[in-house]
Amino acid sequence: MGISIKNVDVSSLSPMMQHYVKTKEEYKDCILFYRLGDFYEMFFEDAEVVSKELELTLTGKDCGMSERAPMCGIPFHAAEVYLNRLISKGYKVAICEQMEDPKQTKGIVRREVIRVVTPGTTLNTQALDETKNNYIMSVVYVSNRFGIAIADITTGVFMVTEVDDVRKLLDEIYKFSPAELVCNEAFTMSGIEIDELKNRLNISLSALDNWYFDDDLCARTLKEHFHVGTLEGLGLKDYNCAVIAAGALFTYLLETQKNSMEHLRQITPYITDKYMLIDSSTRRNLELTETMREKAKRGSLLWVLDKTKTAMGARMMRSFIEQPLI
């Protein structure tokens, strides 16, 4: 174990390393890809994690202190390959780019984070199965109700609903099987078995700060994005909890993607009672979309029925099977 970023005296660091530490402080829950020339470099604990997960050589870098900072790096032209491997393991990655040409800059090159890639927000088609949605879900627990928002930023899907008990909530989670789930602190204390959920679904789960779930902020965020004066214009008049979940999710997407998310043009409320309630054990035993043993599509009901010709059709077929109408 090398020197820890938590124990460094920032004032003793080199200017570049001071900027690195400052940037890392803003993205504590992410691995920071820090662009230096033709490489993305990782330092301190990030370097140790990445070197272990990706089997890369761990070296050191002079940082202005008596002890060298742990370091590992990857070529920027091959970054997507390494990035995809980290995302598949459930990590979040903040990409800090050079915003100036080092050859034409005197002093420190200006750098800033241009995007944050997470399991539910990756846009790399090579890392995704185009026949299934890559969902990110937001859940908020307020006044004994659960507000749910689901989005797939690769296809523009954005849906919301509300449920009033844990059983129905778990059905929604298992039904959509999101790659990532964000929630409020109250959700983690609602009686849900968080660790079991993460392990069974291989899901990335994180609790966001409470300000994400501020009622007024969430409502205002949705109204501004969809250009409506009231939530009634979105069909969300009676979806108070879902509005909070959707607003928090949208803010999270804005922060990670660093763009306006204009391709999310519609938000669709739905009622869970219109669909068959299927618990996780039943889904598994019926082998709706994958077999029990091999976890493969071949041999499942989806494999038998799926004669679709396009990726969009394949996603729709999967949706019909996972969420059958009553």
Residue map of PLM features:
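Charged catalytic and DNA/RNA-contacting regions of genome-maintenance
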Residues: M1-I326
